[in-house]
Regions:
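A polyanion-binding, active-site-adjacent surface
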Residues: 2-203
């Protein structure tokens, strides 16, 4: 196992996982465990959410609650499969009472996300919702208006194409967001080429 220190935490370069971190006292207090990204380490598409919720904190995987079910369903609808994409979060620990992660907390976790993306070398990074979009792009984002658009973002020492997408939870509260969500996922699959991964054409 290859581990090294990253800004106060410990990073496992083989598993692409944060194995220890206590940089954010409030998150250390509220979390049950660190929730790392899941999916292939050579995925063409990397989805970045906001932070773990209650289900994710309990199970130790991102997007396993209702939002994750919506994401899985829509991925299948556009010819993708969860097993062939990487899913991770801006912040790896559950914020108390499911609040948005503070700016400092996002910055504390940025080095982990940068290393994860750099190791995977995806064709495209897709930000799910306002928090990850604004964090990676460094500006205010109108998610609904900009959904499906691609911008360049410097993450760590490298620059990656980033596509803005509405958060799957938004489709639960506002069904009118559903079409934009589906079309953005379809555009992401097309951008990555041949359904995002060579195996995805079977779905």
């Amino acid at each position: 196992m290859t581990e090294d220190d990253v800004e106060g935490g410990t990073w496992d370069g083989e598993r692409l996982a944060t194995t220890a971190c206590e940089r954010c006292p409030a998150l250390v207090e509220s979390r049950s465990q660190i929730v790392n990204g899941t999916g292939p380490t050579d995925a063409d598409l990397v989805f970045v959410g906001e932070a773990p919720g209650a289900s994710e904190d309990e199970q130790g995987e991102p997007f396993v609650g209702r939002s994750g079910q919506v994401l899985d369903e829509e991925l299948r609808d556009v010819g993708l499969d969860r097993a062939d994409v990487r899913i991770t979060n801006t912040v790896r620990c559950r914020p108390p009472e499911n609040r948005d992660p503070h700016v400092e907390e996002r910055e504390n976790c940025r080095a982990y996300l940068a290393r994860e993306i750099a190791a995977i070398e995806p064709s495209l990074v897709i930000t799910l919702g306002k928090v990850p979009s604004e964090h990676l792009l460094g500006r205010d984002v109108g998610v609904t208006a900009e959904a499906g658009e691609i911008f360049e973002a410097t993450i760590g020492e490298e620059t990656w194409p980033v596509m803005i997408c509405v958060h799957p939870a938004a489709t639960l509260y506002d069904p009118s967001q559903g079409e934009a969500f589906t079309e953005t996922l379809r555009a992401a699959a097309d951008y990555a080429g041949d359904g995002g991964q060579s195996t995805l054409g079977e779905y």
